[in-house]
Regions:
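Conserved N-terminal catalytic/coupling substructures associated with nucleotide/phosphate chemistry
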Residues: 1-114
Length: 115
């Protein structure tokens, strides 16, 4: 993820989240939709409206990555295994969750379908 990609803004395959929401439903719909579609990325640590990179403290970032991985594992059927990485953008640490196009469609958030 580069600053140029962030400045390009959100699209049907890229979504920004400033923080990790307390309720995973706020981003789980996107994870499932990306798996049911052509894939996509959620960049945590970037404001969606202003595109400002706010980043995360290095002390908290691994806990946040674990929370994302656990939420996806606990919430999706069939299993979705995203690629969750840390990247430095503009000197700040962001979390990039990359969801590939699924091969076992349809994917569901447990309790509901999101296509």
């Amino acid at each position: 993820m580069t600053i140029e990609e962030i400045l390009a803004g959100e699209s049907k395959n890229v979504e920004f989240k400033e923080n990790l929401p307390e309720k995973s439903i706020k981003y789980m719909k996107s994870v499932v939709a990306f798996a049911n579609g052509t894939g996509g990325k959620i960049i945590f640590g970037t404001a969606d409206k202003t595109r400002e990179v706010v980043g995360f403290d290095k002390e908290d970032v691994f806990k946040k990555m674990d929370a994302i991985a656990n939420a996806v594992s606990d919430s999706c059927e069939p299993a979705i295994i995203p690629d969750i990485t840390l990247q430095t953008v503009d000197g700040k640490t962001v979390i990039v969750v990359e969801v590939s196009e699924g091969r076992q469609r349809p994917y569901y958030k447990i309790g509901r379908a999101h296509v």
